[in-house]
Swiss-Prot record:
Major localisation: secreted
Gene behind the chain: flaB
Naturally occurring in which organism (per UniProt): Campylobacter jejuni subsp. jejuni serotype O:2 (strain ATCC 700819 / NCTC 11168)
SUPFAM superfamilies referenced in this protein's UniProt entry, alphabetically: Phase 1 flagellin (SSF64518)
Family: Belongs to the bacterial flagellin family.
One GO cellular component term noted in the UniProt record for this chain: bacterial-type flagellum
Alphabetic keyword roster: Bacterial flagellum, Secreted
Name this protein carries in UniProt: Flagellin B
Claim: Transmembrane is one of the keywords in the record: no
Organismal lineage: Bacteria, Pseudomonadati, Campylobacterota, Epsilonproteobacteria, Campylobacterales
Membrane-spanning intervals of the chain: none
Length: 572
């Protein structure tokens, strides 16, 4: 072998291998100390890019989970607030139910209305003060609010919370048809009751017979109320236009085909003869008589069949000729505030004919606090005895008074020129259905004694409230009002339940989304760990390998350097 001292090939090889081993040992120590397989781009450039992307995705998903939990917190806050509002509505409906019986006086009903007003104030207070991070939740401004729930932009869930103030909920539709003055067979159809389909009811006969009339029609409508959302009530009443005055019925006087005969009665039916005679056959006629608080004769059909008066009931009863055949008025209620669309055949016999006066109104919960104006009151069926019909056209007041059936014709004791006190006869009278029609009904001409500028005071002042529908007191202070508030409170409850149901659906959607992205986040982190994190078992083996090689490399270099000493032996 050759001996060279200028170039120690063995030492160079040992050094080169030692450098490689030292570098690998450093990498292994770095991995073991950091727990990461990739500590720099040089370790695995593509792996690092993938791992960084996965790390970003996992972090974004973590924030998306937080966003979803914030959204759930917002919706839960609104839901709990509405739960309290629902309890308030339950109390309002309970108080309205308490007021909906004639054992209550105006005083006690007014007390109940005061309670209801306070409850509504608290309901509105909840609606106006419920907030999250300064954001109003129940005021109607929380509309299409977005929550980012994904790793990429525009992966959102939208949430809307409807307004819950008393002015925004409880919107209930009331419709009352015109007074029905003719019998017939009615076929009633609700158009687009569910937004698409029509609902056709069975035909009903409107007459004075048992099992017919508006009572039968209302029963037919109410059988399907759960499906159509429309409920019906009826009022079949014939009321005198003035307090009863002494008079005598004819021998042929009959109601619904049952002859009652001649009855002599006193002012205000003081002897009870007229009421007693009519009620003696009420089980057969279905018509019950009474004298109301104003002293007027009131005939009521409890079961909803018509009231038909034959013969002469006497001028003192003040039953007009056009009221002697009366089949009442039908009232419809719908708990969503939308118009009730009706079609069918012979609708005039149900009060919903093309030429009949139909009162319509949509009323919110807040509106039930205040005074019901005339239009709303009539739509709800207030005082519906003689409304919805015009008495007829006459050239003058005198002409009307002289007409048969007016109660003021010759022989009644109130005829023209008798000098009787007409204002007494017309006190609290209802003459027409709408004040705007006054000029077409009473065309007062010069010379009648009641023309413009007249100073006569025998006739009661012609106020619109005397001749048409009138405003009604607030809320539950009347029986009809209490019934209406019950309907409105029920609608308000349905409205809040719908809003809560929508919120609940969004909460469930958010929860499912959170569950999904939580699993996704775990899987993404697992994938990142597989790429980025070190396998300690494998790396420990590598460390042992390079540690031993480093030690053996040092020994090899030591031996390679010692080989050069052999050259000195040649020189000795």
């Amino acid at each position: 072998m050759g001996f060279r001292i200028n170039t120690n090939i063995g030492a160079l090889n040992a050094h080169a291998n030692s450098v490689v081993n030292a570098r690998e040992l450093d990498k292994s120590l770095s991995r073991l100390s950091s727990g990461l397989r990739i500590n720099s781009a040089a370790d695995d450039a593509s792996g690092m890019a993938i791992a960084d992307s996965l790390r970003s995705q996992a972090a974004t998903l973590g924030q998306a989970i937080n966003n979803g939990n914030d959204a759930i917190g917002i919706l839960q806050t609104a839901d709990k607030a509405m739960d309290e509002q629902l309890k308030i509505l339950d109390t309002i409906k309970t108080k309205a139910t308490q007021a909906a019986q004639d054992g209550q006086s105006l005083k006690t009903r007014t007390m109940l209305q005061a309670d209801i007003n306070r409850l509504m104030e608290e309901l509105d207070n909840i609606a106006n003060t419920t907030s999250f991070n300064g954001k109003q939740l129940l005021s109607g401004n929380f509309i299409n609010q977005e929550f980012q729930i994904g790793a990429s932009s525009n992966q959102t869930i939208k949430a809307t919370i409807g307004a819950t103030q008393s002015s925004k909920i409880g919107l209930t539709r009331f419709e009352t048809g015109g007074r029905i003055s003719s019998s017939g067979e009615v076929q009633f159809t609700l158009k687009n009751y569910n937004g698409i389909d029509d609902f056709q009811f069975q035909k009903v006969v409107i007459s004075t017979s048992v099992g017919t009339g508006l009572g039968a029609l209302a029963e037919e409508i109410n059988k399907s109320a759960d499906k159509t959302g429309v409920r019906a009530t009826f009022t079949v009443e014939t009321r005198g236009i003035a307090a009863v005055r002494a008079g005598t019925t004819s021998d042929t006087f009959a109601i619904n085909g049952v002859t009652i005969g001649q009855v002599a009665y006193e002012d205000g039916d003081g002897n009870g003869a007229l009421v007693a005679a009519i009620n003696s056959v009420k089980d057969t006629t279905g018509v019950e008589a009474s004298i109301d608080a104003n002293g007027q004769l009131l005939l009521t059909s409890r079961e909803g069949r018509g009231i038909k008066i034959d013969g002469n009931i006497g001028g003192g009863a003040f039953i007009n000729a056009d009221m002697k055949e009366n089949y009442g008025r039908l009232s419809l209620v719908k708990n969503d505030g939308k118009d009730i669309l009706i079609s069918g055949s012979n609708l005039s016999s149900a009060g919903f004919g093309a030429t009949q006066f139909i009162s319509q109104a949509s009323v919110s919960l807040r509106e039930s606090k205040g005074r019901f104006d005339a239009n709303i009151a009539d739509a709800m069926g207030f005082g519906s005895a003689n409304k919805g019909v015009v008495l007829g056209g006459y050239s003058s007041v005198s002409a009307y008074m002289s007409s048969a059936g007016s109660g003021f014709s010759s022989g009644s004791g109130y005829s023209v020129g008798s000098g009787k006190n007409y204002s007494t006869g017309f006190a609290n009278a209802i003459a027409i259905s709408a004040a705007s029609q006054l000029s077409t009904v009473y065309n007062v001409s010069a010379g009648s004694g009641f023309s413009s500028g007249s100073t006569l005071s025998q006739f009661a002042t012609m106020k619109t409230t005397a001749f048409g529908v009138k405003d009604e007191t607030a809320g539950v202070t009347t029986l009809k009002g209490a019934m209406a508030v019950m309907d409105i409170a029920e609608t308000a409850t349905t409205n809040l339940d719908q809003i809560r149901a929508d919120i609940g659906s969004v909460q469930n959607q958010l929860q499912v989304t959170i569950n999904n992205i939580t699993v996704t986040q775990v899987n993404v982190k697992a994938a990142e760990s597989t790429i980025r994190d070190v396998d300690f078992a494998a790396e420990s083996a590598n460390f042992s390998k390079y540690n031993i090689l480093a030690q053996s490399g040092s020994y090899a270099m030591s031996q390679a350097n010692a080989v050069q000493q052999n050259v000195l032996k040649l020189l000795q």
